[in-house]
């Protein structure tokens, strides 16, 4: 099951290469639907998702409320998150090591998850330009990541139950201003300028999620592959991160968790290869499809 947010903010479903406008399909078939937006569907839960998916399949088979995926310019799956994006830092060992070389810190695997947040106003759609902000930074960098979306909230979640709290996953690009990151010590500002969280294009329900070993997280800059790692190479896996994040702190439906980036970021090269206006980034997470954004 793959869902997306259409240009008008309404709920869509991707059936093969066909996008179904769910509110329009519901109107044509004279049925009630549990949600008309993707954020609303996440709140409604798994049973609602299955009902929407069955409606999408019926509409696709009859060509109702249907468009070719190539003709759709989706928004971010959750265009206006209700809370800051929760992020894991240095969650792949090779990335921790490349950062250590540049920032004079330990390259050992963190003993505990490194957690920070990104502002909700950083979220932008696939295809939307990422500003280069030359007046604010000279060290603009990319970070390809798999992002989880929480479906069932909870506090003090047992690791064995963690996956049942996940609605699905998507791709996110954790754009970072490395000079601001160093200047301010805390990473929030360096990762929260407007446009610093491209996300999408689709949200894949966890029932359609491959095994972590079969998911690759990749990033290309101007067609050159810079990052590639399997999702099972995380230092802190999904059960561990959800358990820690929910320890004494309630997770809510719609919360977004950026799970960490692999090695290959621009700052890791010698000399560093930071982004410039005119560059194009493509984040490709298995099952989600390319998240493409230019830099302006």
Show which residues each predicted segment covers.
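N-terminal non-catalytic cap/leader segment that marks the start of a structured domain
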Residues: 1-109, 113, 282
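Generic detector of intrinsically disordered, low-complexity, polar/charged segments
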Residues: 6-9, 42, 60, 86, ...
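Short acidic-glycine loop/turn motifs at beta-strand connectors
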Residues: 7-8, 13-18, 150-152, 221-223, ...
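Glycine-centered flexibility motif
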Residues: 12, 45, 127, 154, ...
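Catalytic-pocket segment enriched in acidic/His residues
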Residues: 51-53, 67-69, 73, 77, ...
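Glycine-enriched loop-and-adjacent helix/strand subsegments that border the catalytic/binding cleft
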Residues: 82-239
């Amino acid at each position: 099951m793959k869902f997306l947010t259409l240009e008008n903010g309404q709920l869509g479903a991707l059936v093969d290469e066909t996008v179904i406008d769910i509110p329009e399909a519901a109107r044509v078939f004279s049925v009630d639907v549990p949600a008309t937006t993707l954020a609303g569907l996440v709140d409604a839960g798994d049973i609602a998702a299955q009902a929407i998916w069955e409606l999408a399949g019926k509409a696709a088979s009859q060509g109702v409320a249907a468009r070719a995926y190539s003709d759709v310019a989706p928004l971010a799956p959750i265009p206006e998150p209700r809370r800051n994006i929760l992020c894991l830092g240095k969650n792949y060992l090779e990335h921790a090591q490349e950062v250590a070389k540049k920032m004079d810190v330990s390259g050992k695997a963190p003993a505990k998850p490194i957690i920070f947040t990104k502002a909700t106003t950083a979220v932008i759609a696939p295809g939307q330009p990422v500003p280069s902000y030359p007046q604010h930074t000279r060290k603009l960098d990319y970070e390809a990541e798999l992002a989880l979306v929480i479906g069932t909230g909870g506090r003090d979640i047992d690791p064995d139950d963690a996956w049942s709290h996940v609605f699905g996953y998507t791709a996110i690009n954790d754009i970072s201003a490395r000079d601001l990151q160093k200047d301010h010590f805390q990473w929030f500002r360096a990762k929260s300028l407007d446009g610093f969280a491209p996300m999408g294009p689709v949200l894949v329900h966890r029932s359609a999620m491959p095994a972590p070993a079969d998911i690759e997280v990749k990033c290309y800059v101007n067609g050159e592959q810079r990052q590639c790692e399997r999702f099972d190479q995380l230092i802190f896996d999904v059960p561990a991160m959800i358990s820690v994040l929910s320890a004494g702190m309630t997770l809510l439906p719609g919360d977004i968790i950026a799970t960490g980036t692999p090695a290959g970021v621009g700052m890791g090269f010698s000399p560093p290869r930071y982004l410039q206006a005119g560059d194009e980034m493509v984040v490709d997470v298995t099952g989600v499809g390319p998240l493409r954004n230019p830099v302006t």
